[in-house]
Amino acid sequence: MEYASKDIRNILVAGHAGCGKTTLTESLLYLSGATERMGRVEDGTTASDFDPEEARRKASLNSSVIPVESNGTKFNLIDVPGLFDFETGAAEGITAAESVLICVSGRSGVTVGAEKAYKLALKNNKARMVFVTKSDLENSDYFKILEQLKIKFGPSICPCVVPARLDDGTVAYINLFSQKAFKYESGKQVQIDLPDIGHRFEGLIQAMYEAIAETDETLMEKFFEGEPFTTEEIVTGMAAGVRTGQITPVFCGSAVNLQALDMLLYNMKELLPSAATAAVVGENADSEPVEITVDDTAPTCAYVFKTVADPFVGKLSFIKVLSGKLSATSNVINARTGQPERLGKTLTVCGKKQTDTPAIVAGDIGAVAKLATAKTGDTLCDPARVVTLPAPSYPVACYRMAVRVAKKGDEGKVSGALARLIEEDPAISFTVDPETKQQIISGLGTQHLEVAVAKLKNKFGVEITLEVPRVPYRESIRKSCKAQGRHKKQTGGHGQFGDVWIQFEPIPGEDVEFAENVFGGSVPKNFFPAVEKGVRQAAQHGVLAGYPMVGLKATLLDGSYHPVDSSEMAFIMAAKLSYKAAIPAAGPVLLAPIGTLTAHVPAANPGDIMGEVTKRRGRVLGMNPDEDGEQVVEAEVPMSEMQDFTTFLRQLTQGRGWFTFDFVRYETLPQMLEAKVIEQAKALGNFAEEEA
């Protein structure tokens, strides 16, 4: 069925892990009649969590689009993971939504996941609604949670449905709009007499009236005159407040037992903005701002907000259409590449179920298979109106591990499989370290990379293991030293001869410099390049641990040659012998890479961060507040001390903190740590190439 944009609601369902987001989505799908049986997260049978890893871990790891059709309205519910290692789902989903439904567990209260969801909605200027799940459980405390919400999120919080425990232990739900109460028997609504919740009832009504009155001058006058609002005025005023962000309505119920979900669904339709209200400012081909509003008759403009890489079906691109329609006959180009995109079938997707649809209309969400060049964040548009929409902002991947191929012969498959994986998870990155030659995969944490490894095996047949990346140390010298390098060898009737005196001295920076200061013709000029080549080749391996030498100047002073036996190769060998003789006597030292740590943490945590930086042999540079009210601690820390910092920061801040780390320079490694690094280098075979 095709819906007009005014009858579509695109809603991000977000919150802390385990708060009941997926169960709520599954329950709403079941109540709509789309499924005959309600799936369970514990059994791995929900429409949202269809990935094998999700079923195994009993948690959402990917965002899922679940369309729920009810009473002439289509609700595109974008169920996103609550685990912090999988925040990419929320980052991509928010770009396709007009509203955020924040789930809060009736048992756990307002946790970090709810805070993050609220901040995400604020940052992206999306309407907000709160649903308190598990409200029928004995240890659920709605009014305590309501206070937490007000403390965390301010005066916009406005209760609309509240629970009341009855004498028989069951829970009824009071609709403050209609001032009626209902209980639920096998998911069916039954009206009952209004339970007595004491002075709270009048206070709740008064608070709701006050919030609604602030949205309209006429309602404000009526409020001050003490006149009650009609149900229509309540709904209209509440919807206006939700659109402007003045009001964040709070509902409650039980997804497992299908309680009060009818009231939630009705008010999602009445209070949350429709897809018709969406407007995005992009850029045209001349980088000028262009506002795209939802309009079926305008040139096509659509946005790829999510990609799924399937080894059998191919790439599946999830698309939000902003204007026009998208169908198999649409003439569109990729604004990033300028190339046309041939469209195959357009699809409606519900979890893993795909259904053909004639077109994806303006305001709606659907999918297209096997697009040639499009990737997440790309804009598909009519060539007559080329527009590039803003790309999503993804969390920074700071947890690095090295890749080791499990099966011999799979080396060539790894980069291709990882490229496919990165298509569907842009928070993952993959590089080859030019120093260590290791393949490095980066993600948001240990779970993130564990799941990536599992997907590579299950989806692409590539098996890898992860190990701690090697640290790219360097070596240098502290003093000058001069040494002779004499290469003389007789092979049959032809000999090899090269003789040099080279002075090696430390210099600032990380270069290896070569100079010559030869008087007379002791070493002919045509052999100078060979001497330099020998020095540079030798400097690839230090004498302590085999790491590259930096901050070194080599000056050719003297030497000798043979008119017949001297050659380029002989002088290369002579230069290497001089290097090997001089460097051990020049005070060789190991250098460790140092990076700048920029950690964003709540106001309560800077002291802990500074203490941890000191423990990790770092130096605190300063601290400043950021635009989100958090504190930003800047420090310099050795790279070798940063491997587990992601885990530390997450535990310290309960997932609120994040950081970046960028290499800045090399510094001398403390002598007490040299022996350990040298031993590790020998175990890794750092001297193998040099000795060969």
Predicted regions and their residues:
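Structural and coupling elements of P-loop NTPases
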Residues: 1-692
